[in-house]
Amino acid sequence: MAARALRGPAVAGGGESSDSEDDGWEIGYLDWTSQKLKGQTLPIEEKKEKFKKALTTGDVSLVQELLDSGIISVDDTFRYGWTPLMYAASVANAELVRVLLDRGANASFEKDKQTILITACSAHGSEEQILKCVELLLSRNADPNVACRRLMTPIMYAARDGHTQVVALLVASGAEVNTQDENGYTALTWAARQGHKSIVLKLLELGANKMLQTKDGKLPSEIAKRNKHYEIFNLLSFTLNPLEGKLQQLTKEETICKILTTDSDRENDHIFSSCAAFGDLEVFLHGLGLEHMTDLLKERDITLRHLLTMREDEFTKYGFTSKDQQKILAALKELEVEEIQFGDLSEEARLEISGDEFLNFLLKLNKQCGHLITAVQNIITELPVNSQKIVLEWASPQNFTSVCEELVNNVEDLSEEVCNLKDLIQKLQNERENDPTHIPLREEVSTWNSRILKRTAITVCGFGFLLFICKITFQRK
């Protein structure tokens, strides 16, 4: 193919390489030997060779000169059917593309289902040059939805190769964002497969459906995980993008104005703001399969804290079905920590409670500590070990560490107070055992009473047996 000399076979989608390697498109080299075998070089053949070389080296002035001669047309096809415009697009030479289009080149030309727009989107070059080429072709009515033989559209190639602005321009020009190729891949799937986080965010913003599966039943998130792009896996699996589809309702001009910017700082700010928008409410609802309730709750300014304290009548008020309520209530039951009424401790401090009540208090306190330990263990398990895998925007780590230090101090104070309580109880127990005037426990009194009852019963039985013997003796006499 025409691009073979620069980057190997320029197979964008439908254009497979040929069996022959002699296509005459070597950069900086013309096959003069083959011409000599023909006996002599004809002027027209010489001009064609010069034209090929000019396209290869990007010599715009020579291309214009040869086109002006009238011997060569912009729609002439070289070996394997490529036109000059297709070759210029394959090397992302925007200036050559402009010259050829101004000369009347057909922007909608295709060869074996490979369009010029597909060739431009899969070109090797800077994104700036590729973007200019694509913009020129779209301005000449190139169709952004024509697919190659593998059913891949231009947006899939742009997403695969990491060209964020090209993806956005194609969508603004009418490209279908959720089209699937022969393997069921969408543009989002290709971006997830290649690890292009910025394109994943942009596609979600443009309305990409992250739940579309491939032919083998894989979601984009699973494709990302399989290729070890764990940050994208987390982004697609555990969060819901609040900007999803936000740009779909804008006009083409408004969309281009919003998405085509070369300011890297603005682009980075957008990426981080998109990440920061993911919150604990979305994560909680996604874990329960209730993503559809996110927008409704956000519209009513309901936070996760509010959700966790809602009553059943409030769930009904906000449109939760009985099945949704059961899911949330079951989750709340697992998270529930039995509350201790610490306001009653003043009574306990005066020892105006029974032993059973005091024991119940200690059991509740122990249970609550167990819940807290489990909660911390779960957090440790869920936190990523690599900072690159953190999707949500976090505050300064110093804030977290300072709170953890306070927690450690509080736990140490609690441990000290519990030890003091234990020592006090042990001291009271020892003093009671050594006090000769202490009242026996209820269990001890009941044991003593049972012994008296047993002895009385034996005495009565013995006396009755004696009367029975005397009666029999008296009757015999």
From Swiss-Prot:
Full protein name:
Ankyrin repeat, SAM and basic leucine zipper domain-containing protein 1
Does the entry feature the keyword Repeat, yes or no? Answer: yes
One of its Pfam families is: Ank
Chain ranges of the SAM domain: 274-336
List every position bearing Phosphoserine. S17, S18, S20
Regions annotated as coiled coil: none
Subunit composition and interactions: Interacts with DDX4, PIWIL1, RANBP9 and TDRD1.
Main function: Plays a central role during spermatogenesis by repressing transposable elements and preventing their mobilization, which is essential for the germline integrity. Acts via the piRNA metabolic process, which mediates the repression of transposable elements during meiosis by forming complexes composed of piRNAs and Piwi proteins and governs the methylation and subsequent repression of transposons. Its association with pi-bodies suggests a participation in the primary piRNAs metabolic process.
Q: Name one GO cellular component term.
A: pi-body
> What processes in GO biological process is this protein linked to?
cell differentiation; male meiotic nuclear division; regulatory ncRNA-mediated gene silencing; spermatogenesis; transposable element silencing
Q: Where in the cell is it found?
A: Cytoplasm
* The keyword NADP is assigned to this record: no
Any idea which UniProt keywords this protein has? Answer: ANK repeat, Cytoplasm, Developmental protein, Differentiation, Meiosis, Phosphoprotein, Repeat, RNA-mediated gene silencing, Spermatogenesis
Q: Where is region (Disordered) located?
A: 1-23
Where is it chiefly localized?
cytoplasm
ANK repeat feature ranges = 46-76, 80-109, 112-146, 150-179, 183-212, 216-245
Q: Which superkingdom does the taxonomy of this entry point to?
A: Eukaryota
- Its encoding gene is what? ASZ1
